[in-house]
C-alpha cells in the first residue's frame, strides 16, 4: 500500500514540475498567433502618425488613442514589449526612410520613420496607455 502511495506522490510531483515548466515556457512565448495577435496593434498606426508627423487624423485623437491602448491592453503584459517591437518594425520599418519598400503602406512619408518609431516605443508609458510590461514597469527596451 505504501508503494502505491509513493508512486502516486511521485506522479503528482512530476506532473507539478512539468506543469510549472509548461507554464513558464508559455508565459514567455510571444510570437504572432501565440501570445500576440497576428499583425498586432494596427489600430495604433494612425494614432502614432497623427501624433508625430501631422498626419490628418481619421477620427478624433482621443478615439484613436483609446483604440490603440485597448489593443495594447489586450496583449499580455509579458508580451507587450514584443508586440510593440513587432508593430514598430512592421508599421514603421527603418528601411522606409532608406528607400526600401515598406511592409505596410507608409503613413506621413515626409516624416522620418525614426520619429514614428521613437514615439511608438512610448505607447505603454504613463503619458500614453499607462500599461505595465514584463519588467513591472511600462518601459520597453529594444533596438
Swiss-Prot record:
Q: In which tissues is it expressed?
A: Endosperm.
UniProt entry tagged with the keyword RNA-binding: no
Q: List the disulfide bonds.
A: none
Q: Which residues form the signal peptide?
A: 1-24
Concerning Pfam families, the annotation shows: Tryp_alpha_amyl
SUPFAM superfamilies from the UniProt entry: Bifunctional inhibitor/lipid-transfer protein/seed storage 2S albumin
User: Entry's InterPro entries?
Assistant: Allergen/soft/tryp_amyl_inhib, Allergen/tryp_amyl_inhib_CS, Bifun_inhib/LTP/seed_sf, Bifunc_inhib/LTP/seed_store
**Example of a GO cellular component annotation carried by this entry:** extracellular region
Subcellular location, record wording: Secreted
SMART domains linked: AAI (SM00499)
UniProt keyword list: Protease inhibitor, Secreted, Serine protease inhibitor, Signal
| Record-level Gene Ontology MF annotations | serine-type endopeptidase inhibitor activity
* Function description: Trypsin inhibitor. No alpha-amylase inhibition detected.
Q: Which family does the UniProt entry place this protein in?
A: Belongs to the protease inhibitor I6 (cereal trypsin/alpha-amylase inhibitor) family.
The name of this protein is Trypsin inhibitor CMc
Q: Which gene encodes it?
A: ITR2
Amino acid at each position: 500500500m505504501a508503494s502505491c502511495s509513493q508512486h502516486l506522490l511521485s506522479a503528482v510531483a512530476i506532473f507539478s514540475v512539468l506543469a510549472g515548466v509548461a507554464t513558464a515556457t508559455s508565459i514567455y512565448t510571444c510570437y504572432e498567433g501565440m501570445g500576440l495577435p497576428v499583425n498586432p496593434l494596427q489600430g495604433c498606426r494612425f494614432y502614432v502618425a497623427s501624433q508625430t508627423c501631422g498626419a490628418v487624423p481619421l477620427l478624433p485623437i482621443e478615439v484613436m488613442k483609446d483604440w490603440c491602448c485597448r489593443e495594447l491592453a489586450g496583449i499580455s503584459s509579458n508580451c507587450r514589449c514584443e508586440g510593440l517591437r513587432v508593430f514598430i518594425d512592421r508599421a514603421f520599418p527603418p528601411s522606409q526612410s532608406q528607400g526600401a519598400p515598406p511592409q505596410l503602406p507608409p503613413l506621413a512619408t515626409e516624416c522620418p520613420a525614426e520619429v514614428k518609431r521613437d514615439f511608438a516605443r512610448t505607447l505603454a508609458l504613463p503619458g500614453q496607455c499607462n500599461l505595465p510590461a514584463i519588467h513591472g514597469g511600462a518601459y520597453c527596451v529594444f533596438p
